[in-house]
Amino acid sequence: MSNKYISQLFVKSLQTQKLENSIAKNEKNTLVKGLIGSSLSFVISSIFSKNQKSILLILENKETAAYHFNDLEKLNNDNVLFYPESYKNPYATSNTDNSNILLRADVLNKINTNPNRYLVVTYYKALFEKVITKTSLGFCLFFFNIN
C-alpha cells in the first residue's frame, strides 16, 4: 500500500473530519487519543494538507516526537520542523548540545521571518526552556560600521 492510499483512508474517517471541524472553529486546545503507531502522523498530515494554519504538535518525549517528525517529513516533504530541547541533561545547563541550539534557532527564525505555515513537532521539555524575545534581543545587539 502506498502512503497516498493510506492517507486517503484517514482523510475520509469520521474522527479526522471531527478534528478538522474543531480546528476550523478555532478551538484552542484539542486532544487526540487512541491513535497508535504512525496513525497519528497520517491524521495530522491530512489535516495539515487541508488546513491553511500552522500546527504545533506536542508529544510526550523526545523519542516519540522524533518518530512522528520522521513520518511527517516523509508524508509532507516541506514545512515540517523539529523543535528540540537544548540541554543534554536536565539540570546541567553548562552541558548543552550545540546542534540542538542551532535547530531551535533555525525553527524560531523560520517561524518569525517566513509567512508560510509550518508543522512544528516538539515535546514538553523543549517548550519549557526560555527563549529571548525579539524586543529584548534588540536591546542587546550592537552594530558596527567598518570603513
Where are these regions (language model features)?
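ASCE RecA-like P-loop NTPase motor cores
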Residues: M1-N147
